[in-house]
Amino acid sequence: MRLTIVSVGHKMPDWVATATIEIKEIKPDLTLAKEAVKIAAAIPKGSRVIALDERGKDQTTQNLATQLASWRQEGFDITFLIGGADGLDPSLKTTAQAIWRLSSLTLPHAMARVLLVEQLYRAWTILQGHPYHRE
């Protein structure tokens, strides 16, 4: 199972680079529709797509861990999409298998990246029985 995070944005502060590894940089000076073309091209073939949007479905860390276990067992690769300042183009949301939100708050996309990576790590530690996550 591979997890891919596709995100748009300007050069991130150093703390973002410390928390994440940039897989592919997408230029931020494009319109929403042009961003959608670039984002769609960055999605690995056959990958299930989860769009992150402030109006998406709430998730819990435990639910994420359960979902990761299911995807791993089924052999699915997953791509998480994080939009720029204007969010994601509607075409990306309609083609996504799910739309999730990380918070009821509106988050800057740099913070959303870090939060997503931390939650993926936390969910993974739950599956491994590691004591990082505490109820």
Curated annotation (Swiss-Prot):
InterPro entries: Alpha/beta_knot_MTases, RlmH-like, tRNA_m1G_MTases_N
One Pfam family per UniProt: SPOUT_MTase
GO CC, any one term: cytoplasm
Residues annotated for S-adenosyl-L-methionine binding in this entry: 52, 83, 102-107
The keyword Signal is assigned to this record: no
Gene3D superfamilies membership: 3.40.1280.10
Catalysed reactions, semicolon-separated: pseudouridine(1915) in 23S rRNA + S-adenosyl-L-methionine = N(3)-methylpseudouridine(1915) in 23S rRNA + S-adenosyl-L-homocysteine + H(+)
Keywords assigned by UniProt, alphabetized: Cytoplasm, Methyltransferase, rRNA processing, S-adenosyl-L-methionine, Transferase
Compartment(s) where it occurs, according to its Swiss-Prot or TrEMBL record: Cytoplasm
GO molecular function: rRNA (pseudouridine-N3-)-methyltransferase activity
Main location: cytoplasm
EC numbers: 2.1.1.177
Biological role stated in the UniProt entry: Specifically methylates the pseudouridine at position 1915 (m3Psi1915) in 23S rRNA.
Family note: Belongs to the RNA methyltransferase RlmH family.
Subunit structure: Homodimer.
Protein name as catalogued: Ribosomal RNA large subunit methyltransferase H
